[in-house]
Amino acid sequence: MKHITCIEDLRQVHKRKVPKAFFDYADRGSYSEDTLRANVDDLQAIKFRQRILVDVSKRDLSTTILGEPAAMPLILAPVGLTGMQYSDGEIHACRAAQAAGIPYTLSTMSICSIEDVAANVDKPFWFQLYVMKDRGFIKELIERAIAAKCSALVLTVDLQVIGQRHADIKNGMTVPPEWSLSKLLDFASKPAWVAGVLRGKRRTFGNLVGHLKGTDDITALGTWIATQFDTTLNWKDIEWIRSIWPGKLILKGVLDVEDAEEAAKTGAEALVVSNHGGRQLDGAPSSIEVLPEIVDEVGDKMEIMFDGGIRSGQDVMRALALGAKSCMIGRAYIHGLGAFGGPGVDKALDILRNELSVTMGLCGVNTIAEIDDHVLAI
């Protein structure tokens, strides 16, 4: 992987190795993708102050996330269908995160189940939860996460209604899926992916297996999921989840100051400033645009995490400078996974680690705690 020097390099390999439908599922956004682009562009528009003649020989990226030590201020975000990018992808990604000394978040919509991942890693991981109409099943998922010793619950709060993603529809990533000659030919042109994913033992929504009587087929489960996102979800439901989840609770998908104020009243330990990677409300502001005001409003009440548009270590530095305590990455590590499996995730994390370290040095800071808006040219 010597020729791989940035996340975009991993993205290009990912694009070549994985069928278009699954690559686009990870890479694209909703509607016109304005918010997806804004996440990236608004971060890159933020400029740094270059500082000179400062001793930066002892740079240290370590920090704490929710009171636990972390080797750097990164978290692998929950990504649905990770195991369709690379066979047993969730296990590979979790192992890479734990080797790097950072948290991994397993999606409700994963291919590998909570139990699959727990049986194949050495340390606790986080679990992401979608609240569905079937509250009994949600309680069961929480109980399974507790049994697996998951150390935090990430509750996604911005998916009561699913944003329309044009690329998914055009690629037949619908429920039920649409098959075409072009899709079959695309699959046939990716023999390594077919051998790993389609011939692997895990090819359905692992956390949902057994819930529908009589079938574990991914199409049937997908059809059920499409009917389960709950438009009645409200703050009282958060109270209920808080009452049955004994560990750290994180609310993911907050973009508005008023919502952040309500989030701070729930007893959650943290929130994630996020627009679901530009996959939900197209036309919403970028995550970095709203981060400072949310930090100002509730940063003294709960830990603020950032998600959306991170493609480099410089982007991590920008988010930290504007008040985030840590950053979630999704596409950045999924590109590594789709390109090279577990070693690709290792590579993505190595790239981000090195870029963050170099940027800290050029801005004259040695520790994560030193990073604030003084490193920015604003």
Where do the model's predicted regions map?
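Short, conserved beta-strand segments within well-ordered enzyme catalytic domains
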Residues: 47, 62-64, 73-77, 103-107, ...
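Alpha/beta enzyme core
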Residues: 81, 95, 120, 133-306, ...
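Alpha/beta catalytic cores of nucleotide-metabolism and tRNA/nucleoside-modifying enzymes
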Residues: 1-44, 289-378
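An N-cap/entry alpha-helix motif that binds or orients negatively charged groups
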Residues: 1-67, 172-233, 369-371
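A gly/proline- and charged-residue-enriched helix-loop-helix capping module
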Residues: 99-120, 124-138
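Glycine-rich active-site/cofactor-binding loop and its immediate structural neighborhood
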Residues: 70-109
